[in-house]
Structure formats: C-alpha cells, structure tokens
Amino acid sequence: MLNQLRPALVLTFALTLITGLGYPLLITGVAQALMPAEANGSLVRKGSVLIGSQLIGQNFASEKYFWPRPSATGPEPYNAVASSGSNLGTTSDKLKERVAADIERLRAAGIGGEIPADAGMASGSGLDPHISPEFARVQIARVAKARGLPEAGVDALVDRATQGRLFGLIGEPRVNVLELNLALDAPRT
C-alpha cells in the first residue's frame, strides 16, 4: 500500500514546492527586475511620505480637490481590505437612495447640468482610482473657485491627466484622481 501511496505523496510535495514556492518567487523576481514600481504597488511618495497608490482610489473630501467616484467598500470609503462591489441590483431601493444622495451632494457643491454616470455609481471593486474626463470636467469650476485658480488652468491639468484607451481600442478615457490632485498641489512656474 505504501508503494502505491508514495508516488502520490511525492508528486503532491513536489508540486506544492513548485507552484507554492518556486513559481511565486520566480514571478516576483522577474517583476522586481523588469518593473519594480509596479511590482511594489505603484506607490506614490512625496519625499519619504507615502501618499497613496496609483492603483487604489482614495477619498478626497476637500473642495480643493477633485472627488473620486463613490466607493462600495461599506461605511469606511476606499478601505482596500473590504474591496468588493455593492452587489445592489438596478431595481434596489438602497442603490437608488445612495445614488440620489451622491447626486444631491454634487448639486449642493454647485455642480449643475448633467451628472456623469460614474459620479453616482461605484466601480466593481469599489476602489477604482479613475473617473471619467466628463466627471472631472463638471468639477473644474468648483475646484478652481476653491483654489482661486483660473478655470482654464485647471482644465489644462485635466487634459494632461486624461489617459486614452489602451492601444487606442480598449477601455474608456480616464483620469487618475490621485495624480490629478497631486498636479493641483504641485508648485506652479
């Protein structure tokens, strides 16, 4: 019986070492060698202070900053540990109430006209760091007024921060909120 069991145990042990230890170490080593910033989470630092990650959204509540799309991570917005969608269906009263509250907050901040969909809808992960260029544009007047800047200058920052489709085909144009807000804080020449 042990003769029949030995090959299975050896194979299980060998595959555990290969797939559980060898492969992850190999991929980590290759990633660290070829793209260390991305392998370490695309972290953004100001000097030695960690500001955030280009890959995970964070909450900006000040009038002086562009606001992200709503987070679906529960009572603590942009909590990466609680990453998930809200799982609320399109007919859910809770979803309708949340979207209405988000739109009301935007209206109270002086944003008029048509509100882009991503201003009221969370992403699938609840942590998307991007907003649509349209959502950024409807916030330009609010941010410019709060900072005492000309709208044209803030509009130019939005243009520079807008990323196009991948290979010109995949996805939608998007603006990384953290990068845009850091550009707002950068010294002007």
Curated annotation (Swiss-Prot):
Name the source's superkingdom.
Bacteria
User: Per the record's keyword annotation, is Signal included, yes or no?
Assistant: no
Q: Does the keyword Acyltransferase apply?
A: no
Classify the main location.
membrane
Q: What does this protein do?
A: Part of the high-affinity ATP-driven potassium transport (or Kdp) system, which catalyzes the hydrolysis of ATP coupled with the electrogenic transport of potassium into the cytoplasm. This subunit acts as a catalytic chaperone that increases the ATP-binding affinity of the ATP-hydrolyzing subunit KdpB by the formation of a transient KdpB/KdpC/ATP ternary complex.
Q: Which family does it belong to?
A: Belongs to the KdpC family.
The identity of this protein, by name, is: Potassium-transporting ATPase KdpC subunit
Organism of origin = Rhizobium meliloti (strain 1021) (Ensifer meliloti)
